[in-house]
């Protein structure tokens, strides 16, 4: 075996432990679901109620850091010596497609119902103030604030990979300027990487858990095929197969094509909902919600409700911030990989403006449509959820539109492709992170990429078959706590190294390889 091939091989200490840990967690969870639910819910309650303030301050501080990057002395620094690998349009499309999935369509269609039925700030459910703040909170949770945290970390990873010419692309390797090479190559670095990989694998399982029943309900609506475990397994297997085909063509071809198709189809479906779902109301509702967001944003940023104890910030804001934290490193590594040649300012502005526009578009159109269906008594969403579950309620919000069969076909295809692009990005990053070394411009071995997608698919099928996905989904949020600290360390390491290297290229001018 050649030296290069050997360097591209699997790193056992970060490849096998996550698989073993995930297997043990699955076994412990499904061994006694009732007991597991009690333990996991208790942990979730403890994290969100006792440490919720930490997630809120994290988001605020990272948002301030984004302004520092955009307007500071590093704004014009280029992340790599070559021209951008992708056109600006394809670059934004790839970011949008890889950072969203059927989970976005899931929450975009139903989230507003939860906000208006159990609103924050002591408001009465289904009241006018509750409906006014409903979309505003969605714009808050899926707006500039979280995307800014991703752009900061993306700059950090792009800096270490393309400017500092690092051969390893996983979280621990970026911490050399902060903790030293000895600790990075020792137990500390191994623990950091394994925390990251375990959280990523479980997060992908959660995404499959949201997407699979949504697609299954589409199939039941279109073909009358009942929801079974066999159908779940077939759907996940198809996703894994399509992902294997995509990665076989490499990052440039496979991901770009899937991302472009997903993005164009998203705009097509959203345009249809916008036109037939009441364009005038949706635009007016969005405009009013932006004003509501600006009015309430200071309180939203720091809302923990310790006096009223209504539970809204714990159930939603802290939950979403923890969700963003879990995906931050994984997505930032991928976003850094496709942002080679961009300036710091270009990456920060491109991510926040482009991705915020995309998520705001989705939540405004889908949320506005759902609100109208509730107001006009076309759908009884609480009854649908009680009798059939949340996925059926979401399907009915789409089926209520004109040309329901054609609409459902479009929604089915969109959910399917959206999840393929997410799995594609995740499996690619998993492969990069579990190889011994990655040189600039190189891609992880094909078999490793396909192998990760297959293994994650198997985990998803097992979780669905055993019925243990729901407690695992809750455990992911609590499990995001270690990544909270890892994200902070990566950020501090970047700031420390850039302060020296981008000033006079000394003393860290030597190539950092681990």
Swiss-Prot record:
Give the keywords, sorted.
Antiport, Cell inner membrane, Cell membrane, Membrane, Transmembrane, Transmembrane helix, Transport
Mapped to this chain, the residue ranges on the Cytoplasmic side of the membrane are 1-11, 69-91, 155-185, 250-251, 336-347, 435-445, 493-514
Q: Where are the transmembrane segments?
A: 12-30, 43-68, 92-112, 132-154, 186-216, 231-249, 252-277, 312-335, 348-369, 405-434, 446-464, 469-492
User: In Gene Ontology terms, what is one molecular function of this protein?
Assistant: (R)-carnitine:4-(trimethylammonio)butanoate antiporter activity
Q: Which InterPro entries match?
A: BCCT_CS, BCCT_transptr, BCCT_transptr_CaiT
Q: Where is this site: Important for substrate binding and transport mechanism?
A: 262
User: What is this entry's stated membrane topology?
Assistant: Multi-pass membrane protein
**Which catalytic reaction applies to this protein?**
4-(trimethylamino)butanoate(in) + (R)-carnitine(out) = 4-(trimethylamino)butanoate(out) + (R)-carnitine(in)
Annotated Pfam families: BCCT (PF02028)
Q: Which GO terms describe its cellular component?
A: plasma membrane
Query: What is the role of this chain?
Result: Catalyzes the exchange of L-carnitine for gamma-butyrobetaine.
Q: Into which family does the record put it?
A: Belongs to the BCCT transporter (TC 2.A.15) family. CaiT subfamily.
Assembly behavior: Homotrimer.
Provide the protein name: L-carnitine/gamma-butyrobetaine antiporter
């Amino acid at each position: 075996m050649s030296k290069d091939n050997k360097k591209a091989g699997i790193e056992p200490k970060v490849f096998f432990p996550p698989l073993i840990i995930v297997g043990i967690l699955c076994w412990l969870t499904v061994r006694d679901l009732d007991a597991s639910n009690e333990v996991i819910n208790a942990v979730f309650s403890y994290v969100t109620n006792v440490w919720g303030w930490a997630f809120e301050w994290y988001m605020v501080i990272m948002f301030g850091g984004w302004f520092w990057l955009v307007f500071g002395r590093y704004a014009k620094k280029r992340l790599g010596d070559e021209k951008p690998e992708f056109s600006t349009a394809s670059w934004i499309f790839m970011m949008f497609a890889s950072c969203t999935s059927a989970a976005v369509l899931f929450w975009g269609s139903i989230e507003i119902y939860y906000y208006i039925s159990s609103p924050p700030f002591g408001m009465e459910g289904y009241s006018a103030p509750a409906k006014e703040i409903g979309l505003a909170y969605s714009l808050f949770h899926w707006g500039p604030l979280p995307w800014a945290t991703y752009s900061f970390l993306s700059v950090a990873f792009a800096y270490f990979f393309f400017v500092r010419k690092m051969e390893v692309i996983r979280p621990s390797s970026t911490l050399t300027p902060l903790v030293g090479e000895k600790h990075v190559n020792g137990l500390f670095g191994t623990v950091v990487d394994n925390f990251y990989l375990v959280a990523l694998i479980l997060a992908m399982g959660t995404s499959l858990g949201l997407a699979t029943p949504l697609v299954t309900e589409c199939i039941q609506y279109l073909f009358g095929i009942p929801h079974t475990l066999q159908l779940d397994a077939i759907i996940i297997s198809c996703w894994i197969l399509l992902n294997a085909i995509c990665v076989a063509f490499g990052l440039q071809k496979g991901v770009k094509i899937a991302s472009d198709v997903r993005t164009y189809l998203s705009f097509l479906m959203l345009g249809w909902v916008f036109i037939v779902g009441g364009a005038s109301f949706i635009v007016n509702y969005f405009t009013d919600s932006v004003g509501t967001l600006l009015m309430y944003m200071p309180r939203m940023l720091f809302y923990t409700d310790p006096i009223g104890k209504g539970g809204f910030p714990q159930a939603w804001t802290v939950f979403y911030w923890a969700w963003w934290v879990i995906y931050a490193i994984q997505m930032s590594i991928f976003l850094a990989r496709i942002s080679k040649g961009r300036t710091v300012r270009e990456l920060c502005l491109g991510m926040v403006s482009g991705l915020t526009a995309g998520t705001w578009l989705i939540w405004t159109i889908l949320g506005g449509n759902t609100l109208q269906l509730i107001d006009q008594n076309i759908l009884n969403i609480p009854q649908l959820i009680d009798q059939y579950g949340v996925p059926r309620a979401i399907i009915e919000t789409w089926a209520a539109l004109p040309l329901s069969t054609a609409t459902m076909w479009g929604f089915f295809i969109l959910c399917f492709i959206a999840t393929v692009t997410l799995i594609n990005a995740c499996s690619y990053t998993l492969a990069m992170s579990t190889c011994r070394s990655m040189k600039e411009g190189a891609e992880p071995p094909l078999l490793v990429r396909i192998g990760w997608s297959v293994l994650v698919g198997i985990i998803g099928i097992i979780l669905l078959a055993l019925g243990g996905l729901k407690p695992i989904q809750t455990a992911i949020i609590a499990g995001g706590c270690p990544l909270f600290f890892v994200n902070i360390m990566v950020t501090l390491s970047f700031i420390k190294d850039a302060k020296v290297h981008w000033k006079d290229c000394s003393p860290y001018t030597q190539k950092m390889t681990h």
